[in-house]
Design a protein with these regions (language model features):
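Conserved glycine-rich beta-strand-loop-beta hairpin in the small C-terminal domain of fold type I
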Residues: 68, 240-251, 263-282
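All-alpha amphipathic helical-bundle segments outside canonical DNA-binding/catalytic cores
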Residues: 36-41, 268-272, 285-287
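Conserved C-terminal alpha-helix-loop-beta "cap" of PLP-dependent enzymes
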Residues: 201, 205, 277-287
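Short beta-strand segments
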Residues: 64, 116-119, 149-152, 179, ...
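Conserved core segment of the aminotransferase class I/II
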Residues: 105, 169-241
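Conserved core of the PLP fold type I
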Residues: 2-144, 149, 155-176, 243
Length: 287
């Protein structure tokens, strides 16, 4: 209540509160972004942000990784938008496969709304796009005049603290960036943001107002006050250490179970560098 209950418990506007802006800018700078605070749109997490984005634009189809976040597929389906999954490798979405899918879709008369990807510690494969891969994907989008939706819930969760430049930092006027505090603060607070190209701000803000009416000013104030007092470094390092330990525990359990069942060599995986996911592949068939 000391944060200002007379204001925080009232209706709000579809703009990020001034108290939350420093917390967002602190995270954004770590992946080479410099958002304009006036363009930031509040969400109740990136899932709602994704639903807002897909409901704001026309199109029949979203192109994404062949294995992708199930919540994204649900959001696209709820908006009546079909998805086309394209081939991925250890660096995530393949640029040549993306270009082929775009050409094929347009040849068949489909209107492609956007490309969707999680470039850092992707769900579910855990892949990380190199800087060269990111540049190549953005070139395909630029060559075909396509928007790209960047979903970035795990970008701060590298086990060794490494970060990569956000796609948004490399092409600010083509990328719609979805951020969330669910993975770096607490999922129960339900707070995130959209950083869209400048020419799409008002359209997305109108959708935000329709879908949420009043983003939680109280939740934004809680996060903003935490950041004002503590910053992000200590909390992020705690999360990284926790997930690093969990990954080691999981890999140890897998190795022990495969040895116990004489299945060593049947399954392979890449050592995760961060995020939540470990992707297993069967030597005979991918699973």
């Amino acid at each position: 209540m000391r944060l200002g209950s007379r204001i925080l418990l009232q209706y709000s506007t579809p703009s990020v509160s001034s108290s939350l802006v420093p917390a967002i800018l602190d995270l954004a700078e770590r992946t080479c972004m410099s958002p304009d605070p006036r363009n930031l749109i509040p969400t109740a997490g990136s899932q709602l942000g994704l639903a807002m984005v897909i409901n704001a634009f026309d199109g029949d189809e979203i192109i994404c990784d062949c294995a992708t976040y199930p919540g994204a597929l649900a959001a696209f389906a709820s908006a009546g938008v079909e998805t086309t999954g394209v081939a991925s490798d250890e660096e995530g979405l393949n640029p040549d496969a993306l270009a082929h899918a775009v050409a094929e879709g347009r040849a068949n008369g489909r209107r492609i709304a956007a490309v969707y990807t999680t470039p850092t510690f992707q769900n579910p494969t855990g892949s990380v796009q190199s800087e060269n891969r990111r540049a190549a994907l953005l070139k395909v989008c630029a060559d075909n005049d396509l928007l790209l939706i960047e979903d970035d819930p795990y970008g701060m969760l590298s086990f060794d603290g490494q970060t990569w430049p956000a796609l948004k930092s490399m092409d600010p006027q083509r990328v719609i960036y979805l951020g969330t505090f669910s993975k770096v603060f607490a999922p129960g607070v339900r707070s995130g943001w959209i950083d869209p190209p400048a020419n799409l701000v008002e359209k997305l803000r109108a959708v935000c107002e329709i879908m949420t009416l009043s983003p939680s000013a109280l939740n934004q104030a809680i996060i903003g006050e935490y950041h004002r007092r503590h910053g992000w470094d200590e909390l992020l390092e705690g999360y990284r250490a926790s997930y690093r330990a969990r990954a080691r525990l999981l890999i140890g359990a897998l190795e022990a179970e495969l040895a116990r069942t004489n299945c060593t060599g049947t399954w392979t995986w890449r050592e995760p560098r961060g995020g939540f996911y470990l992707w297993l592949e069967n030597v005979a068939s991918t699973s």
